[in-house]
């Protein structure tokens, strides 16, 4: 991952953040069962600790993928945090329920509909050797909610959460 961090790739595609006293965090646009499988299998080879997956599924899109995505994440990640993606005109809770329906042990999934908080939680609770995948939105910078769009960037949220974590760590060390 250190080498990957030095390469300028496509924003939102296996894009690494963190490292150096913080967990590695990877943002990827994986939004199908096949893409999520591929990225989790690839990242597993780099995870020295837990592999944590934060994702949701888009609204008004292929609902049949949702249970499959839940099954993939449960099988390949050590911890799963389910959240909103782009709910569009669908209820986020209904989308998450469909994802959970594909899991054998849905009670083990952490549910935080507010995507920014889900990202922060995953990064705040990850150990230095853990690897966090934030999947589904990649480089997107807006979220569709009903009839309106709001600015939202996984990449910016990850950077902010890592900065907050570094600040909290600095305060703990300085105290």
Say what each PLM segment does.
Residues 2-175:
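ATP-dependent carboxylate-amine ligase
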């Amino acid at each position: 991952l250190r080498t990957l961090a030095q390469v300028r790739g496509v924003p939102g595609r296996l894009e690494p953040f963190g490292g150096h006293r913080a967990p590695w965090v990877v943002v990827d646009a994986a939004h199908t069962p096949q893409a999520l499988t591929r990225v989790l299998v690839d990242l597993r080879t780099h995870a020295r600790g837990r592999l944590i997956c934060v994702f949701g599924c888009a609204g008004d899109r292929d609902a049949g993928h949702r249970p499959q995505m839940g099954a993939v994440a449960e099988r390949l990640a050590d911890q799963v945090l389910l959240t909103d993606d782009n709910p569009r005109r669908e209820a986020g809770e209904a989308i998450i329920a469909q994802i959970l329906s594909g899991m054998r042990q849905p009670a083990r999934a952490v549910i935080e509909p507010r995507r920014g908080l889900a990202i922060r939680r995953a990064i705040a609770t990850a150990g230095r050797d853990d690897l966090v995948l934030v999947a589904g939105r990649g480089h997107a910078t807006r979220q569709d909610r009903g009839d309106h769009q709001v600015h939202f960037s996984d990449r910016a949220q990850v950077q902010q959460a890592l900065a907050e974590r570094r600040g909290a760590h600095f305060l703990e060390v300085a105290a």
